Amino acid sequence: MSAIRYELIKTDKQTGARLGKIHTPHGTFDTPMFMPVGTLATVKTMSPEELKAMGAGIILSNTYHLWLRPGEELIREAGGLHKFMNWDQPILTDSGGFQVFSLSKMRDIKEEGVHFRNHLNGDKLFLSPEKAIQIQNALGSDIMMSFDECPPYPASHEYMKKSVERTSRWAERGLQAHARPEDQGLFGIVQGGAYEDLRAQSAKDLVSLDFPGYSIGGLSVGEPKDVMNRVLEHTTPLLPANKPRYLMGVGSPDSLIDGVIRGVDMFDCVLPTRIARNGTCMTSSGRLVIKNAKFTHDFRPIDENCDCYTCKNYSRAYIRHLIRCEETFGIRLTTYHNLHFLLNLMKQVRSAIMEDRLADFREEFFEQYGFNRPDAKNF
C-alpha cells in the first residue's frame, strides 16, 4: 500500500481546478497548497509553530543541502527529519537534481549518475538515482522525488529527447531502490522542456511506472509565462486524476492561480522568503519594496487587507527602519507576511473552487494586484 493517497473533493465548474486532500504518514493537508521551503531543515527565520499558525500544511526540505550539511546519517540518528527539526506534519524532499545542475559549475552527466563539484568547497561528488533515494530514505520525508536531469531553457529538441529518456530510466532505477514505499511516497518528475511531444513521452513513461504522485519539472527556469501555461495545459491531462500533481519551483501569485486552473495541486518556491530578506513584500495591491524612501513616515501596515502577525502589529516605517539597518527581526516580519500572504491566497483559491468561481476570483485578484496593467511589476 502506498504511503500517499490523494482524495478529490470537488472540481471547479468554471475551470476544472481541483480541490482535494493528500493523506500522508504525518497527517493530511488540503490542496491546492503552497509549500514553504526549508532548505536546511528550517524555513529561514520561522519557527515550526509560526508555520503551523499561518496554515502551512506541509513544508519542503532540500536533499542536496542536507546531504552536505549535516549529512543524512546524522539526521537518521536523530530519528529522521521530522524529529530533527521538531516538525510533526508532512515533509516533502526534492531529489537534489536541481541543485546539482544549478549550483555546480563543473558536472559530468553519465548514465550511472552525475559527477560534480561540491559548491561549498570544490570536493568531487557523485549523485545517482539510487543515492538520491537512499539519502531521502534516511531523511524519512513523507514525499520523495525521483532523481532527474534538469536541462536549461532553452535546450534543443535533440538534447531534450535524450534527457527525457535518461530521466525515465533514472526514475525506474529510483523506484527499484526505494526501501520504504509504505512509509514514504515517491513521485516521478515529468520533464521535456517546452516540447509537447517530449512532455507527452515523459508523462507516458512515468505513468507506466505507477508512481503515487507526479511532479512537473523543468518550468519556471526562464521561459515566458505563456509557455509555462501552455506546457501545463498539455501535460496535466496526461497525468492520472487520482494522483497528486506538483509544479516545482513556482511561487509568484499569478503563477499559483494559473497553475491551479490548469490542474496542479502542489507548489513550492523560495520566492516569498528570498525576496522578504531584501525587503520586498507581496500585498493584495501588488509588490511593495519596503526600503523605498516613500515609506519613511508611513505608519500603515504592509497590507491593510492582511491580518497576519506582522500587519496587525507593525508599521511600514518601522519595518523599513529594521530592513535598512539589517536587523534580523525585520527579515522575520517580512518573511512572516509573505508566507502568510501566499498561504492565505491558496486558502482563498480553495474557497473559490468550492464555490465554483475560480475564474471570477482570478479576474478580481489580477485586477486588484495590478497584473492587468501594462506596467505590471512581478517578482
From Swiss-Prot:
Zn(2+) binds at C306, C308, C311, H337. GO terms for biological process: queuosine biosynthetic process; tRNA wobble guanine modification; tRNA-guanine transglycosylation. The keyword Transcription does not apply. It catalyses: 7-aminomethyl-7-carbaguanine + guanosine(34) in tRNA = 7-aminomethyl-7-carbaguanosine(34) in tRNA + guanine. Residues 249-255, 273-277 are annotated as: RNA binding. Keywords: Glycosyltransferase, Metal-binding, Queuosine biosynthesis, Transferase, tRNA processing, Zinc. Binds 1 zinc ion per subunit. Pathway: tRNA modification; tRNA-queuosine biosynthesis. Its EC number is 2.4.2.29. It is an enzyme of class 2 (transferase). GO terms for molecular function: metal ion binding; tRNA-guanosine(34) queuine transglycosylase activity. The active site is at D94, D268. It holds the Pfam family TGT. Substrate binds at D94, S95, G96, G97, F98, D148, Q191, G218. The keyword Iron does not apply. It comes from the Bacteria. GO terms for cellular component: cytosol. Its cofactor is Zn(2+). Homodimer. Within each dimer, one monomer is responsible for RNA recognition and catalysis, while the other monomer binds to the replacement base PreQ1. Catalyzes the base-exchange of a guanine (G) residue with the queuine precursor 7-aminomethyl-7-deazaguanine (PreQ1) at position 34 (anticodon wobble position) in tRNAs with GU(N) anticodons (tRNA-Asp, -Asn, -His and -Tyr). Catalysis occurs through a double-displacement mechanism. The nucleophile active site attacks the C1' of nucleotide 34 to detach the guanine base from the RNA, forming a covalent enzyme-RNA intermediate. The proton acceptor active site deprotonates the incoming PreQ1, allowing a nucleophilic attack on the C1' of the ribose to form the product. Belongs to the queuine tRNA-ribosyltransferase family. PANTHER family: QUEUINE TRNA-RIBOSYLTRANSFERASE (PTHR46499:SF1). This is Queuine tRNA-ribosyltransferase. It comes from Listeria welshimeri serovar 6b (strain ATCC 35897 / DSM 20650 / CCUG 15529 / CIP 8149 / NCTC 11857 / SLCC 5334 / V8).
